[in-house]
Amino acid sequence: MNPLCSEFTSSSRKAPEAAIGQVLIEALPYIRKFEGKTFVIKYGGSAMKDELLKNSFAQNVTLLRKVGINVVLVHGGGDAITRTAEKLGLVSQFVHGKRVTDNDMITVVQMTLAGKVNQDIVRLLSEHGGKAVGVTGLDADTIKAVPGPNAEKLGLVGDVESINTDYIDLLCRAGLIPVIAPVGYDHNGNIYNINADDAASSIAIALKAEKLIYVSDVEGIQVGERILKTICKAEAADFIEQGIISGGMIPKVLSAFKTLDGGVRKIHLIDGKFTHSLLLEIFTHEGIGTQFIAEQDNDQQENR
């Protein structure tokens, strides 16, 4: 063997091995800290479409469960619903980003979210060693709904009235990963399409979760050229007033702080377009996205 080649190969292996070791050491206190805690993860965006990202996400979720964290997954599926509707000759319409849902469309929503999308996620987690169970908001009154405030325009789009935390806790105690499709029904048996972000927030509050994590297509809250590592409520209000946070990011930020007000300790916004972004956000000091905290606190700022 060429000595020069041998030396080059050996040295090139040391750097990544050291880096992996450092990440594992850095993760250890977080693993201890979060054992037995509950994380609610809203799964959406590119991480649901790209095969590499899907597998990376499934590996991350499975690892969280294996180290003793209770993971509750709430998923979207808007693109899949639109595709199914098109195949059936239905046109998708939206008002302020929410899908107009009539009787035909709610059937498509149920069929796509509870059937195809939900079961695909369960299968993917199972392939990576996770014990997942598919749940819809209709199962065991997991999500009880009420008509939304704009029912005359949106139709069967609902808001969350209550969450059956006993059922979700039962699944978590059994070592399972509940994968929840965001549909629910009211006291009259009417079925509603529920925004996945809103459902995840309500579930996190009801479960008194340690964290709510939004896996999306944005890197976090951007101010100028940088992504904020941490933002508190007062800072967010200032940024909104100054126009630094604007457009579609405003409702996301307001929803995050509403969830904090409901008792969830931290909210995280991370970019699902990066492989293993979930682990990098949770188990490293720097994180990869933006964490939302109720107020400035050095301990909360410095740790994920």
Curated annotation (Swiss-Prot):
Top EC group: transferase
Signal peptide: none
The reaction(s) this protein catalyses: N-acetyl-L-glutamate + ATP = N-acetyl-L-glutamyl 5-phosphate + ADP
GO terms under cellular component: cytoplasm
Name of a matching Pfam family: AA_kinase
GO biological process: arginine biosynthetic process via ornithine; L-arginine biosynthetic process
Keywords in alphabetical order: Amino-acid biosynthesis, Arginine biosynthesis, ATP-binding, Cytoplasm, Kinase, Nucleotide-binding, Transferase
HAMAP family linked: ArgB (MF_00082)
Protein name: Acetylglutamate kinase
Gene symbol of the encoding locus: argB
